[in-house]
């Protein structure tokens, strides 16, 4: 079955070149492990260098493959508890049903969503519904694929106000080493991206966005270069003269180090630059 992307994953390759390998202004640690009983644990914590504020989260996941069930529990330092139950590929091939709930013990606030997604060879569909008896918000998206071309639509409808609150379109093309993505959000925000895999070591990306009625055009270019199987360098720059640099090194299997820096090219001597440090551990 063809892996037709969801609407949010359109243009993902270009986004990854811009976003992965950076962690400006923070120290971050990620840990992932799996018990012998099949329970997956993942935890992360980060501290911002400018404010000193620290936060973290913990997630456990258990899969019952014979029944297509996945149970996920989440907790963060804001004392928010989350539970997610998903059922996949059993009622129909490519169909995934999910119940996602959030509970805040300090305030007693509860919220939840019912989610459904369906993927086949040439399309993918999805819908989320807020569990809110005062008037749920309905989210929906669809992506069609044909010979590398991708067309997508995303919407949200506020039933309490009987109003369409989101209305987005996207069009793109995907090949083995090249991707093009364009989108229009609510008829006012326009954007596009180009991803190119030059060879096995070099990936490049260009991003462009602007808003109707404004002269503020956002433009950026990014690149990633693999020095070897363990080391990679990343760099990006935008029209605001913000320069991002990243260095990723696999120290040993399951241990990855990331160093990054954000430089303000317009105020190079004034300071205000940001650095970041990240560790990823997997066992």
Curated annotation (Swiss-Prot):
Entry keyword set: Acetylation, Ion transport, Isopeptide bond, Membrane, Mitochondrion, Mitochondrion outer membrane, NAD, Nucleotide-binding, Phosphoprotein, Porin, Transmembrane, Transmembrane beta strand, Transport, Ubl conjugation
Glycyl lysine isopeptide (Lys-Gly) (interchain with G-Cter in ubiquitin) crosslink site(s): 53, 109-110, 266
Residues the record lists as N6-acetyllysine modifications: 12, 15, 20, 90, 266
Keyword Transmembrane tagged: yes
GO cellular component, one term: pore complex
Catalysis: reaction(s): chloride(in) = chloride(out); K(+)(in) = K(+)(out)
Keyword Manganese among UniProt keywords: no
InterPro entries reported for this sequence: Porin_dom_sf, Porin_Euk, Porin_Euk/Tom40
UniProt modified residues of type Phosphothreonine: 4
Modification sites for N-acetylcysteine: 2
Compartments, record wording: Mitochondrion outer membrane; Membrane
Positions of modified residues (Phosphoserine): 241
Segments traversing the membrane: 26-35, 39-47, 54-64, 69-76, 80-89, 95-104, 111-120, 123-130, 137-145, 150-158, 163-175, 178-185, 189-198, 202-211, 218-227, 231-238, 242-251, 254-263, 273-282
GO molecular function: nucleotide binding; porin activity; voltage-gated monoatomic anion channel activity
One Pfam family of this chain: Porin_3
Subunit note: Interacts with ARMC12 in a TBC1D21-dependent manner. Interacts with MISFA.
Function: Non-selective voltage-gated ion channel that mediates the transport of anions and cations through the mitochondrion outer membrane and plasma membrane. Forms a high-conducting channel with a stable open state and a voltage-induced closure with a mild preference for anions over cations. Involved in male fertility and sperm mitochondrial sheath formation.
Domain writeup: Consists mainly of a membrane-spanning beta-barrel formed by 19 beta-strands.
UniProt family annotation: Belongs to the eukaryotic mitochondrial porin family.
Name the record gives this protein: Non-selective voltage-gated ion channel VDAC3
Organism for this UniProt entry: Bos taurus
